[in-house]
Amino acid sequence: MTEHVVPSDAARELFGETLPVAQRYAELLADVGVARGLIGPREVPRLWERHLMNCAVVEELIPKGADVIDLGSGAGLPGVVLAILRPDLSVTLLEPLLRRTVFLNECVELLRLDNVRVYRGRAEEVHAKLRADIVTARAVAPLPKLIGWALPLLRKGGSLLALKGERAEAELEEARHELARQRPNIADVIRVGGGKVDPATTVVRVTVTTALETGTKAAPSRSPRKPGGRKKRGRKR
């Protein structure tokens, strides 16, 4: 299927000198990713516009040299894309499923991404171990649940960047109660990549304004995972 993975002129301009690495990643998604059920075959013709470029424009919101955790990384969207486009970032791909972490490790090795590590686990299992300036998430969970998983991973002043669709504003309203239960934060909906991608990428940004006090447990999600399995959420990853 790799013959269908041809970057547009807009993609060439956006990725610039990192395009060859991005092209190789797109080919891995179209070939190995499809074969292992990590991405649907119907997505291959639109890998660049709907997936890689949609993720890439989020880099506008990430400060230079930031530590990034890509929560529920799946096949590496957006974490691998951001690591390719921004070598200054230190990216942790956090993913609980073995078959996905195997693929992610293969990508990191084949693409020679020295700024990436793959960590197998669930967000709630690593709240005491990992911290970042930015947590990204795409097609992982409804916003109220995602907030409970992501915010404890953030340093003071850090932001959750949740890539969402047309219901972004509605999801944010539905998450107001959960936001109030967490440490102080500021939440908004922004659109990035105007003029580069059409439509622009919609992001719910939640920035925490205080540090998580030492010895203080983060407020748990109102909808915790059930023991013994991971409930399927959103699109197939």
UniProtKB/Swiss-Prot annotation:
The keyword Repeat does not apply. It is an enzyme of class 2 (transferase). It comes from the Bacteria. The keyword Secreted does not apply. One of its GO terms (molecular function) is rRNA (guanine-N7-)-methyltransferase activity. Residues 223-237 have a biased composition (Basic residues). InterPro entries: rRNA_ssu_MeTfrase_G, SAM-dependent_MTases_sf. Residues 210-237 are annotated as: Disordered. Its EC number is 2.1.1.-. It is found in: Cytoplasm. Keywords: Cytoplasm, Methyltransferase, rRNA processing, S-adenosyl-L-methionine, Transferase. GO terms for cellular component: cytosol. Specifically methylates the N7 position of guanine in position 518 of 16S rRNA. PANTHER family: S-ADENOSYL-L-METHIONINE-DEPENDENT METHYLTRANSFERASES SUPERFAMILY PROTEIN. Belongs to the methyltransferase superfamily. RNA methyltransferase RsmG family. This is Ribosomal RNA small subunit methyltransferase G.
